[in-house]
Every structure is written in structure tokens, then in C-alpha cells.
């Protein structure tokens, strides 16, 4: 992971936001954004990787992140990474694909979410979710080939 003052701030906020959450397999949820951040190669993508589920899955808002001093590019990418319940999943993915920060983070997020070693038993619901992730990855990778 890249360690700068800004990434350390995001790391602490991520930990605080997710500290009491667990993932579908019962592991501390915070391991997921930490893993995604480990895949990133620059400060901006590392910060967004750490914060990518904070607004969607916790009580934090974009305004809270702005108050913490995160810049416009970070806030825009986090906003794009935040899936609103009323938006079809692939429409949400299509909206973020033209933002290079959000696209890089989402690809790593999808790869980690598709990792069978962290899923456990693969039932029909999980198969459908994995298929949805596969389509999302194809959509994002299609954009990067232009």
C-alpha cells in the first residue's frame, strides 16, 4: 500500500467506518478495502480504494469526506463508486467507467469480490452475483481497450 498523509487519513477513516462490519464469510469487512487498496499504484486510487464502500455501506456521507479534506477528484470517484439501490447494477458500472480512478478501483473490487477463496459455498444467488461481476468487468475492460 502507498503510505502518504492522505492515504493514512483514508486508512484510519476506513477502519473506523467498517470496524464493526463483517463480510458474507464472517471475516472483518475492513479486510476487503485494505486488499483493494493494496492493488493500487498511486495515491488517488489507493485513497478511493480505501473509501469505496464508506458512503454506500456506513453512515459517512460525501460531505463528511469533504470535511476531512479529501479533494474533488477523490470525492467524485467515491461518489461514482457508491451504488444507489434504485440504479440497475450495470447502469451504475457504466457511469463510472469513464473515470480512470473509479474504473481502476472497481476492477480490483470486482476481482476481490469474485475470489472464490473468500466466498465459501457457491449457491445459486452467489452464482448470479458472480455472473453480474463478470459482466461488469467486461464492461470496464471494454472501455480500457479504446
What are these model-derived regions, one by one?
Residues 1-146:
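Active-site helical microenvironments for divalent-metal-assisted chemistry
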